[in-house]
Design a protein with these regions (language model features):
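Extended, Lys/Arg-enriched charged tracts that mediate electrostatic binding to polyanionic substrates
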Residues: 192-284
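Short, glycine-/Ser/Thr-/acidic-enriched flexible segments
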Residues: 257-258, 317, 356-358, 370-371, ...
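Pre-Walker A adenine-sensing motif
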Residues: 340-356
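Glycine-rich phosphate-binding P-loop
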Residues: 355-386
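Conserved nucleotide-sensing/catalytic segment adjacent to the nucleotide-binding pocket
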Residues: 388-458
Length: 576
């Protein structure tokens, strides 16, 4: 990142490497503050015409109005109102209607708070710069500087100090340290080599963001040409998040205009250590937000067999401005790779439960979006006090099954976090996540929160499967748990992948997708069919119970009670 400050698409980025403001005068004299005032005045012209017209008429031009805001703010941090007017009488315009000026100051503060704000430090080599000792401290000091400057201006104009203070996040919502590192870059991807890697992420929750889209549409198809060959990314516009998606080392390149999705990865996937990617070749590369000139959405993957790298691609357009396009492409890439490795991807949830009587069980609940897998976990959590001594979430959307050397089938996760609908969480639990969640479009349908729920060590430990259940969200049933002795019947239910859509995508009504997993198995169906029969046969031989759990999630009036009732019945079965 070469500029000290950029502002676009409601996102402000402040480069601490080039400019770090530690006094009020430095802050108010900075290029970044001027850009913020310019953007604020443009928003006034659009949304607060009366206020805009009043001041532009008084100062003759918009440029003079902007300069007068900046200069008067500088003076107000040092002098009282009378002294400011004495410096230059033109500033008296602001104090002729003091209430209007206070409203202007408040509106500017609100405008700044509504922006997504990021601070960045870039180091030319590891161990340099602010990040090792002072990065978090520098962000805390910057937050306090912005807050104290704003309050000083308010107090000076009012003529008295405030008596109630609210310690809000006035600096950055999130902060990144970047390192320039070398990785084993094939010649085809030399245009990616200069992009800095994210080494540290600091999030100031609650982080609330608004995106252009609120649902995801379609599936990702294989492409026959490499979309990354010969492209060159501008190091001023791009970042790399080195993620561990399950067992796959993944380099996620994202454009700065989709910053919230890149930062959201920190709550969802393990951030790799430098030793895990310096000089290494990744399993997966995903480029998110490349401006290729196409107006329509282009999202696909390509198998680079020569370099043994799976490539994901999403072009720059408003349609991809939803975290689902970041998360689900990465999971698709992961699953395609796991199928190549003869492992079976599972779209669902897995939990390790230890009951109060000491009995332990590892449960896999499989189902596509809206089937009730996450809601079942919430129901388990709500029953914690009555039944459970301990509960570990192995995965809460995507995982994979692996055949171990002793022949047992074990489950592994892909994510350390979850991207879940706020409406489907218990309200108390949803509010408990305020101190660590990234909230997206919280006032809209399909509002989401990305929260950490596990550790990488837990999801990659490997847990032997005891129960394998398909989440049926659309059939009424008095018996919530049904097991099948006929393996072919069970496989048909799992492969049919039926569920009633709940609005998490653009689908409606009763829909089906092969193996309830449009993120890999649908694209690689022939290979997956072989694996399904192998794994289900091995599980049956190993005594794993295979069946359905009726969540009733899509049945009118059952969205809350259905998963709860199913969880109670499941615990009774485990307890037998």
């Amino acid at each position: 990142m070469l500029h000290e400050f950029t502002l676009s698409r409601g996102r402000a980025m402040i480069n601490f490497t080039l400019k770090y403001c530690d006094t009020k005068q430095k802050l108010l004299s900075s290029y970044g503050f001027k850009r913020a005032v310019e953007a604020f005045v443009k928003s006034l012209k659009r949304d607060e015409v009366i206020i805009y017209d009043h001041y532009v008429k008084a100062f003759k031009t918009e440029e003079d109005f902007i300069e007068s805001i900046i200069e008067s703010f500088k003076l107000l941090t040092v002098f009282n109102v009378e002294e400011v007017i004495a410096v230059d009488n033109k500033y008296s315009v602001f104090f002729e209607d003091k209430d209007l000026f206070i409203e202007l100051i408040d509106l500017m503060g609100l405008f700044w708070k509504k922006l997504e704000r990021y601070t960045i430090v870039r180091n030319s080599r590891l161990g340099q710069g602010l990040q090792n000792v002072r990065f978090i401290q520098a962000n805390d000091m910057f937050n306090e500087l912005v807050l104290s400057t704003w309050r000083r201006i308010q107090d000076t104009v009012n003529g008295y100090e405030q008596r109630v203070y609210r310690q809000m996040t006035a600096g950055a919502n999130a902060s990144l340290t970047l390192n320039d590192v070398s990785w084993n870059c094939p010649i085809e991807y030399k245009g990616l080599a200069e992009i800095p890697f994210i080494s540290t992420v600091v999030i100031q929750p609650p982080f609330i963001s608004y995106t252009k889209k609120n649902t995801r549409d379609g599936i990702f198809r294989e492409h026959q040409q490499n979309p990354l060959e010969n492209i060159v990314l501008n190091e001023d516009d791009w970042f790399v998040f080195p993620a561990k998606v399950g067992s796959m080392l993944t380099f996620v390149y994202f454009h700065k205009d989709f910053m919230v999705h890149g930062v959201g990865l920190a709550n969802l996937f393990e951030l790799a250590k430098e030793s895990e990617y310096i000089g290494k070749k990744p399993d997966i590369i995903y480029v998110f937000g490349y401006p290729d000139g196409a107006e329509e959405k282009r999202t696909f993957y390509y198998k680079d067999k020569k370099n043994d790298i799976l490539i994901g691609y999403a072009n720059y357009c408003d349609d991809i401005d939803y975290f689902g396009y970041m998360k689900k492409m990465l999971l698709t890439l992961h699953n395609v790779k796991q199928i190549e490795h003869r492992n079976l991807p599972i779209h669902g949830a897995m939990v390790n439960i230890v009951l109060k009587n000491g009995k332990e069980s590892n449960i896999v609940i499989m189902g596509d979006s809206g089937a009730g897998k996450s809601e079942s976990l919430e129901a388990f959590r709500s029953l914690n006090a009555s039944y459970i001594r301990h509960m570990r979430v192995i995965f809460d959307d995507m995982g994979f099954l692996k055949k171990e050397e002793d022949g047992s089938i074990t489950g592994y996760g892909t994510e350390i976090g979850a991207f879940v609908r706020i409406d489907d969480l218990d309200p108390a639990y949803a509010y408990e996540q305020l101190d660590r969640g990234i909230y997206t479009n919280p006032d809209r349908i399909n509002a989401r929160v990305t929260i950490p729920i596990s550790t990488y060590e837990v999801i990659m430990k490997g847990y032997k499967v005891d129960l394998m259940l398909y989440a049926n969200n659309y059939t009424e049933s008095d018996k919530k748990i049904v097991f099948y002795d006929d393996l072919d019947e069970a496989i048909n239910i799992f492969e049919d992948g039926a569920r009633k859509a709940k609005g998490t995508t653009t689908e409606k009504g009763l829909v089906k997708s092969y193996f309830a997993n449009p993120f890999g198995p649908v694209q690689e169906q022939a290979e997956t069919e072989v694996l399904v029969r192998e794994f289900f046969s091995d599980m049956k031989k190993d005594g794993v119970k295979i069946g359905e759990i009726h969540t009733s999630l899509a049945i009118e009036g059952k969205a809350k009670d259905g998963p709860h009732e199913a969880a109670v019945e499941l615990f009774s079965l485990i307890n037998e």
